[in-house]
């Protein structure tokens, strides 16, 4: 069976491939191999720039050609690495051998080949490649999509800034609010957590077999290898080196990133559920696309499926993100291998997250405001002005105002404009205060 969108086991690469293809250059097997090649090449170049005595004679004009090994890396190259791995049964060693083959193609580089992967362990490559892929995926794909969602919400918040709406707390009518303000709450929350995510450190482990640069020191004790590692990781990869590690990354900062994404996802779940409710309450209608079907049995239905799709995908994403954040920082002694297979899944929750963001955006762009229904609900819920009345009465030192309004409103009788105004007329306050109270409506409170 040929692997394609119909035969893929995961819906990320199957049904939703069109939405997640943007992540393939960061989290696919091909992408991981390319990132490994990139780190190996940049490390070799940095050794030449040091320079190690044996690399002083390396022609720096070849650096451009070396960088083309990863900048022009294609699927055929990745397939070659996989073929080598069938023999080595080791993915990172296969990358090293592939680069040596590429050196042979350039020619004249035989004396320098053993400085590929010099003094390193596999995790020096993996624990730089993976955070680098996350960094670039966030910058190139995730942040722009979240920004697009925030922008759409901000447009609605501005457009509907002065649209009054009945609030609901505990599912019951509460003091009126403005539709634009309620949407602005989500803009604020998302911006806050997006800033928090952007402020998370992207760190890398780079320090040899057990984090001590043992091999580097024994071969070249005259160099400050910690300073070298700091410079390489920051200048060549744009990451921050973890100063104290075992064989692998501590993963603490990566856990912070996963937790931050999970908080953003949780906010979007909250948003999805609220807009689902607003549609159910008929505050919004949905644009209908010719040919689409809402239910296989009920022809009249236009379901809020985009919000439901988003909520489901975010639930999956958050479960995996929580697992990653909890599992990765835990490893037996100086390392066990459990992080290796787990790290291969870092793209999965981001895949479900971008599916969700796109679904939420799709749902938002279908909205048609039903101001008539919002106005109707306000007209039918005059009891909500009770808070305003009792607060003004408190200002006027009126005796027991809260209790008076409670006695009026907590009955089974319907509260309307007439009921409220009749009550106001009975109050022992000045005519000016009565006029002030009479002017309050569910629409302007």
How should these model regions be labeled?
Residues 2-29, 65, 71, 293-445:
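Catalytic-core signal marking the mid-to-C-terminal active-site face
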């Amino acid at each position: 069976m040929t692997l394609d969108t119909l035969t893929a086991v995961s819906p990320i690469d199957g049904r939703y491939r069109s939405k997640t293809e943007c992540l393939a250059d960061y989290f696919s097997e091909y992408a991981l191999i390319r990132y490994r090649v990139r780190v190996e090449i940049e490390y070799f170049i940095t050794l030449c720039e040091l320079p190690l005595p044996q690399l002083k004679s390396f022609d720096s004009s070849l650096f451009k050609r070396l960088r083309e090994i990863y900048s022009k890396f294609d699927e055929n190259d990745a397939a070659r690495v996989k073929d080598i791995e069938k023999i080595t049964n080791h993915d990172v060693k296969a990358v090293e051998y592939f680069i040596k083959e590429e050196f042979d193609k350039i020619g004249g580089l035989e004396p320098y080949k053993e400085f590929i992967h010099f003094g390193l362990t596999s995790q020096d490559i993996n624990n730089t490649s993976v955070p680098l892929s996350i960094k670039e995926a966030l910058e190139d794909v995730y942040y722009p999509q979240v920004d697009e969602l925030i922008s759409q919400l901000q447009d609605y918040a501005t457009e509907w800034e002065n649209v009054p709406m009945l609030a609901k707390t505990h599912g019951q009518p509460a003091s009126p609010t403005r539709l634009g303000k309620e949407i602005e709450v989500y803009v604020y929350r998302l911006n806050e957590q997006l800033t928090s995510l952007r402020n998370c450190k992207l760190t890398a482990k780079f320090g040899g077999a057990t984090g001590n640069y043992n091999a580097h020191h024994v071969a070249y004790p005259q160099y400050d290898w910690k300073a070298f590692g700091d410079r390489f990781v920051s200048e060549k990869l744009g990451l921050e080196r973890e100063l104290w590690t075992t064989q692998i990354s501590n993963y603490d900062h990566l856990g912070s990133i996963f937790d931050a994404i999970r908080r953003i996802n949780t906010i979007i779940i909250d948003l999805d559920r609220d807009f689902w409710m607003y549609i159910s309450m008929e505050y919004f209608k949905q644009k209908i696309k010719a040919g689409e079907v809402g239910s296989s049995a009920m022809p009249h239905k236009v379901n809020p499926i985009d919000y439901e799709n988003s909520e489901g995908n975010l639930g999956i994403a958050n479960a995996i993100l929580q697992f990653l954040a909890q599992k990765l920082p835990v490893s037996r002694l100086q390392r066990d291998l459990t992080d290796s297979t787990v790290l291969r899944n870092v793209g999965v929750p981001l895949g479900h997250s971008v599916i969700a963001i796109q679904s939420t955006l799709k749902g938002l762009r279908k909205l048609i405001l039903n101001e008539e229904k919002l106005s109707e609900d306000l007209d039918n819920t005059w009891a909500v002005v009770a808070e305003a009345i009792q607060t003004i009465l408190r200002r006027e030192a009126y005796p027991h105002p809260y209790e008076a309004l409670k006695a009026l409103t907590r009955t089974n009788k319907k509260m309307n404009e007439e009921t409220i105004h009749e009550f106001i007329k009975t109050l022992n306050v000045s005519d000016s205060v009565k006029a002030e109270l009479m002017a309050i409506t569910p629409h302007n409170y």
